[in-house]
Regions:
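Sequence/fold signature of self-assembling virion shell proteins
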Residues: 2-29, 36-39, 44-53, 77-79, ...
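Glycine-rich, flexible loop segments associated with nucleotide phosphate handling
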Residues: 101-111, 170-178, 210, 236-243
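Extended, solvent-exposed, turn-rich assembly/linker loops in the middle of proteins
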Residues: 136-210
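Alpha-helical scaffold segments that mediate packing/assembly in large oligomeric complexes
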Residues: 97-168, 297-303
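Generic alpha-helix structural propensity
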Residues: 40, 55, 69-71, 81, ...
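Active-site-surrounding "flap" and adjacent substrate/cofactor-binding loops of secreted or lumenal enzymes
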Residues: 50, 58-72
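Short regulatory "switch" loops immediately downstream of catalytic or recognition motifs
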Residues: 91-97, 160-165, 222-230
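Short acidic, glycine/tyrosine-flanked loop/strand segments centered on an H-E-D-like triad
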Residues: 72-102
Length: 303
């Protein structure tokens, strides 16, 4: 197989794989890969219904008394995209060509094209962070100035809201599957307080971004946490919005499956250039499944 063809094939195969463990905020996403998607399309995505709890007052239960559970269809607008460009110089191409085994060639291709895929992953993470506008806001949308004395209260309030759910018997909480997505600054507060409990099991499960457990949440750090800037008393103040929800059960997503790379060399050039584009869309279909808070986080030495 020609090296250019090998690069395109391996990259496309990697792109189609679900990279859930390599996402940060995207761990809240249930991504479904779709073929033949275009920017601006609206696609049907199957989304898992929430858990249901009802009062039990005695007697037998049968199918007529059980509320339907399973999946529901969510309309997701494909309104996000990322163009991808990378190049391989002759030295890298020769290294791939001269690899002793096919597995070594594949490993090198993955290594040299990894940054392009990571850029797409970051775009998905950012889109998930932006879904905080659908979240149930804590403290009536008033800003909470994070300190070492109240950071635990944000988690407690988020947990309470998720357990309560919609107040009609649907809860958004399930032990062992809850995620908190926070900024590096908020993690700094929690780390200095030594309240994060590390878990080898959870670290292997969640992988990228995982920093520990707290109050039933697997805490994941994301640099792209959503932020807004407001003028307060004549000064610009930046607020950030941590997210709290259930892994793979909070945000619905449609992601392009049939990603195709093009390749070519510039006139007179030696490097092989690769380019392509991928589209996707995300949506938090039920606001009570996602909780956020408007936080002012300023970590300094001595905080």
């Amino acid at each position: 197989m020609a090296i250019e063809t090998l690069v395109k094939t391996i990259f496309s195969d990697e792109f189609r794989k679900e990279r859930w463990e390599d996402l940060n905020a995207g761990k809240l996403l249930d991504p479904q890969f779709k073929k033949d998607m275009k920017f601006g399309d609206e696609v049907d995505v199957q989304f898992h219904d929430p858990l249901t709890m009802n009062d039990y007052e005695g007697g037998d239960l049968d199918i007529s008394t059980v509320e339907k559970a399973g999946t529901s269809t969510v309309k997701v607008k494909i309104n996000k995209g990322k163009s991808i460009f990378f190049k391989l110089d002759e030295a890298k191409l020769d290294q791939i060509k001269n690899a002793k085994t096919d597995n070594e060639k594949i490993k090198l291709v993955k290594e040299y094209s990894a940054d392009a895929r990571e850029q797409f992953d970051r775009a998905i993470n950012k889109a998930c962070c932006e879904q905080r506008i659908r979240a149930t806001m804590l403290e009536n949308n008033r800003a909470i100035t994070i300190s070492d004395t109240n950071v635990h209260q944000v988690f407690a309030s988020a947990k309470t809201a998720l357990v309560k759910g919609d107040g009609k018997g649907h809860t958004a909480w399930k032990d062992g599957e809850m995620i908190a997505v926070i900024s590096p600054e908020m993690e700094a507060f929690m780390s200095t307080m030594k309240i994060l409990q590390y878990s080898d099991v959870m670290a292997k499960h969640y992988k990228k971004g995982f920093v520990g457990m707290f109050m039933g949440f697997a805490v994941v750090v994301d640099n792209n946490i959503d932020k807004t800037t407001e003028v307060v008393s004549g000064e610009n103040v930046t607020y950030e919005y941590p997210l709290f929800g259930r892994a793979k059960r909070t945000i619905a997503g449609g992601v392009q499956k049939d990603f195709k790379l093009e390749s070519g060399k510039k006139v007179g050039g030696f490097d092989t250039h690769y380019w392509g584009k991928g589209v996707f869309g995300v949506k938090a279909p039920l606001s009570y499944l996602l909780v956020s808070a408007k936080c002012l986080v300023k970590f300094t030495i001595g905080s």
